[in-house]
Amino acid sequence: MTTKGVEGVYLHTRNWGKTAKFLEALGYEIEFTTDHGSGTLRHENGPYFVVAEVPQDQEPEAQLVLRVEDAAAFRPDPIVEVVSPFEETHWGTQRMVVRDPDGRQWSVEAPLAK
């Protein structure tokens, strides 16, 4: 089983307000926000952005989120380094983290098993 493509992007920022305005200017709409400098923006049926503010001394990062339909059936090829296997998240999915050949981490997410 392969992924279904890019589902979203986890994006760290040093300024939630400016980043949200930047994404809004590109056509994204705020879906929800929190009281601690984070939120989700979406563009019609396209990938979402989960944006979270990080401290000034932390380097902002971005992580792509790939979608699979069934976590139990997904078996990445041996070339894919699994950093952490599928685990339930507090936002209602199952999430695996993998590392690409350049050391970047990617998320692979699936719906919760029924």
Predicted region positions:
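Core segments of cupin and vicinal oxygen chelate
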Residues: T3-K4, Y10-Y48
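Eukaryotic phosphotyrosine signaling hubs
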Residues: V6-G8, E59-L64
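Vicinal oxygen chelate
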Residues: N15-G17, Q63-Q105, A110-A113
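A short linear hydrophobic-aromatic micro-motif
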Residues: E29, V50-V51, V83-P85
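Short acidic/glycine-enriched loop/turn segments that link adjacent beta-strands
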Residues: D35-S38, Q58-P60, H90-Q94
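Residue-level structural signal for beta-strand termini and adjacent loop
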Residues: H36, E53-P55, E88, P111
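Short, charged/polar surface micro-motifs in flexible loops or helix N-caps
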Residues: N45-Y48, Q56-Q58, D70-F74
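Short, charged/polar, Gly/Pro-enriched secondary-structure boundary elements
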Residues: G46-V50, G103-Q105
